[in-house]
């Protein structure tokens, strides 16, 4: 889901940043409007759609609603707008078209932005609770967050198991952050100097 979001966001953001087409501002405003709508508002329609497609209790049902993110499109668009025009002019002189420029120049320069976006999306998707609880019916399909919640049953609370589960649940987020920390710092410092 994270890889797909980064790819879709990159392609959409590049179109919004570099191309002129009818209703561009209106469409981008609609993309931004999706970031203002809480996920809980559309959960019923998402569930009915997933149910009608026969994707409940499947990995596709878990992943499909989170394939496109307005926040990711916005972040990548802002990055593409900040790229100096000289890069595109030099690539055009060297014979690159739009796709060549995107894949050979803009995307390699965007690695810190990709890393920051991927870490943000990983934490957001990995920590989902309500959607996986709603879509899955078998324990084998449920996420670790739901498993930890199921450790609390009635009057019995086994704190040792809950804390062990919490430690296991937090490890992937910590590892992703540690591995991507250099890229996050590069991304933050890249926007600090204008010139």
Roles of regions detected by a PLM:
Residues 1-195:
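A structural signal for multi-pass alpha-helical bundles of membrane permease subunits
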